[in-house]
């Protein structure tokens, strides 16, 4: 397996792409794959579809990963110049007070802070309560007149942090959900190209608006109409204190890709993913999904007449916080798994269960 391209990964993670504002990351993807893909098209939603044409008649495979990240949106500017905000996606209000944030405007990006009364001024009974998001404000440290000049209602805000390596082989950043996936599925295309291509088409679908309802994955799967749809997304690591593994499963950072199994997953796709991992000598983990998953796989499976669908993940600690943590070696291990899965397909494979 190759080393992680940390420069590319860092650029993805630190480029803002709050749901509905994914254009800058889409530009990075188009630039990255410009000399690799045979075709690149962007649909009206903003999802980028990069296609590597196959050499034969094997099933076409679309792998999706969403470009959007959670964040905040400006809803009101007070006469004093403070910003009120709403969540875009699943933001935990409990982690926001005292945080540095970046406000993205037409004229540039401005650092702000989420205000918090000092503990000395908080009543004892108030200290134990989470301040609702609608009661939090962002301070830009500017006169109100300037704030109202540069900030517009609807401007988006990201956590004011970026990519760092730490510990042994680990990394921390905002937005590994799901820019880790964007990294992986673009790298899969590069690896397939280097290998001379597959027998069927590979479509790298970097999608939009997953965090508010799987909207990009839905429209991409319908529009492209591939034979096989695989979603890549992060899943919850359960290897830190406070997580009940008997309830949530045992999933460890650094123990390899996670392959989902359940009614949302085509059984042939599942078995072939496991077989590919074994062929490549890649350690992998299994995750039980007894219901429809909350990933693009949930939407892609029921497009048109139904799609042979899979879900591959890596274990991630502290999802939807500014300090999401992954093991870097899991990235390229997943690239190798997905590459092997695609290369193993031929025109005789059937994804109809039991046939």
Indicate where each model-derived feature is located:
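N-terminal hydrophobic/helix-forming segments and targeting peptides
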Residues: 1-355
